[in-house]
UniProtKB/Swiss-Prot annotation:
Residues 72-321 form the Dynamin-type G domain. This is Mitofusin-1. Its EC number is 3.6.5.-. Residues 1-584, 630-741 are cytoplasmic. It is found in: Mitochondrion outer membrane. The gene is Mfn1. The keyword Hydrolase applies. Keywords: Coiled coil, Developmental protein, GTP-binding, Hydrolase, Membrane, Mitochondrion, Mitochondrion outer membrane, Nucleotide-binding, Transmembrane, Transmembrane helix, Ubl conjugation. Ubiquitinated by MARCHF5. When mitochondria are depolarized and dysfunctional, it is ubiquitinated by a SCF (SKP1-CUL1-F-box protein) E3 ubiquitin-protein ligase complex that contains FBXO7 and PRKN. Ubiquitinated by non-degradative ubiquitin by PRKN, promoting mitochondrial fusion; deubiquitination by USP30 inhibits mitochondrial fusion.
Amino acid sequence: MAETVSPLKHFVLAKKAITAIFGQLLEFVTEGSHFVEATYRNPELDRIASEDDLVEIQGYRNKLAVIGEVLSRRHMKVAFFGRTSSGKSSVINAMLWDKVLPSGIGHTTNCFLSVEGTDGDKAYLMTEGSDEKKSVKTVNQLAHALHMDKDLKAGCLVHVFWPKAKCALLRDDLVLVDSPGTDVTTELDIWIDKFCLDADVFVLVANSESTLMNTEKHFFHKVNERLSKPNIFILNNRWDASASEPEYMEDVRRQHMERCLHFLVEELKVVSPSEARNRIFFVSAKEVLNSRKHKAQGMPEGGGALAEGFQARLQEFQNFEQTFEECISQSAVKTKFEQHTIRAKQILDTVKNILDSVNVAAAEKRVYSMEEREDQIDRLDFIRNQMNLLTLDVKKKIKEVTEEVANKVSCAMTDEICRLSVLVDEFCSEFHPTPSVLKVYKSELNKHIEDGMGRNLADRCTNEVNASILQSQQEIIENLKPLLPAGIQNKLHTLIPCKKFDLSYDLNCHKLCSDFQEDIVFRFSLGWSSLVHRFLGSTNAQRVLLGLSEPIFQVPRSLASTPTAPSNPAAPDNAAQEELMITLITGLASLTSRTSMGIIVVGGVIWKTVGWKLISVTLSMYGALYLYERLTWTTRAKERAFKQQFVNYATEKLQMIVSFTSANCSHQVQQEMATTFARLCQQVDVTQKHLEEEIARLSKEIDQLEKIQNNSKLLRNKAVQLESELENFSKQFLHPSSGES
């Protein structure tokens, strides 16, 4: 027989294809699970992926891992049933081209035997509930092992692993299950649940020397109740016995055929009449096994004593094998893989929906984030532009306010200087011309003037300055408010309280009047010095009096050291002193030479003109006036003179610092307003920083969302590709006829 490709390869190819697809599907769902989990657990991406999505896709990953393991263990399974000694083991051996299972006289299968291939070169068996691999070298050894194990009952399963190298049929993921006779047990339901639910094909091995028995029919009726239209083949074994009675062969064959057709079509209703004829065969398993063993040994197939009609029976057995292989491969592919294929499509649909929902949520949030980022960028630009404009306006406003304050302080201080005499007159303290008392008196007077002028200036300026500052601060705050968040606007008065501002005038009268020198020595109003002062002025009188009272050759004292001078003018330089000395010496020489003569002449003229009485009266009045002034020159008079001198001196000094004090006050106001504006600018800077951070966060979020969109699209494309592969698998293996049409 020419070698052809076995139909069983169809299952092998299908298993390989579906296993590869499920491997890709598991990899895809695992990748999708990691993607959804990373998206769900990202704290910056809220509500993009839900916990339900994560739980669902992780559940699919676990299910696919289990399905993958199940698929790797999937194989085609054919179960052989029949009465005891009907030749079930012989049929299996004939299909395997070797005597794998014990059969023949003295050998009955006392438990379920599962024959499958192993990649090793040694046969072994494993009993149910044990992982021990028991070595089996020969069939007789296998038979002995089965019969010697007293624990093996009819409902037990023994796995027989036969080297694939010795049997071609076992290379294609086919498992053959031999069973005890259906007439030896009443536990048919247990058998069916345990061994038949995953079988792809059932083979009823009947003895052609008798008809179908009720025990056989009863078993398959129960199978039909548990499975939907099971694939059942009927082998009428030992058909070689009909060769001894050739005249009855066709009648017996027709009789068996009719009963088998009735059983499959009418009773079980699993196939149509035309299909049923292809499920019923008349064979001799023993003949086929012997001929195939001869062929394997290089001997002729027809060698030995064979009954007549062997070739026909051999051909029918081969037809059975061909039909069986086609049926089981199609059936196994459908039963083993169709539901998994449908489940895979459902999983892909669900995962696609999850990816689509993530993609849509990411797209919506990305659009929202982009719009929000644009708003934040616009607001940041607006704040920066407004701050540039407001800074110029605030600088201008501060300049106006400081100039206004400087003018107010200058005017108020000028007025207070004019009223300095009143302030000095209000001062009361112990006065005495002694130096120690005068020192204390001057110190207290300086403090009184400083406190009084400071208080008066504050009364006149502080309220107006405060009102102006508060108004300006409120204007600045109102202008900056729109640049701040609502939460900061409500707390703005707490962050920047509008407190009362007190100007510090810092007159420092003690230091200002530290070089004041009082002149409280008694001076007669009609005395020579007073008259000279009155008519010549202080400077000229000083020069004249200095010239008359000094010796000619005496070096003149520095003007700064004159105790009687009300003020201390600056000492002349060396050249001026020398010039003054020469002039005085010349004048004194001339005056001294003429004084005596002048007095005598003037006195004589007056004496002759008015007489001595008038002179006496005049001298008496002059003396009385002198006496009056001398008596009234009391301590109080000295204090009044001291205060007047101090007022004149302090007025001159205070007028010198009017501009400085006003500038100092305006600087204080400028600092206060600048500080307030700086605090507001800090809040604006914080707002700008928050905006910049928010823009950076949104940009990062947008990039992440874009990446999520791209990843979800890539994963979805993989899902579509896997769907296409599943569809191709369905067309190629599950529905080949529809695919061809």
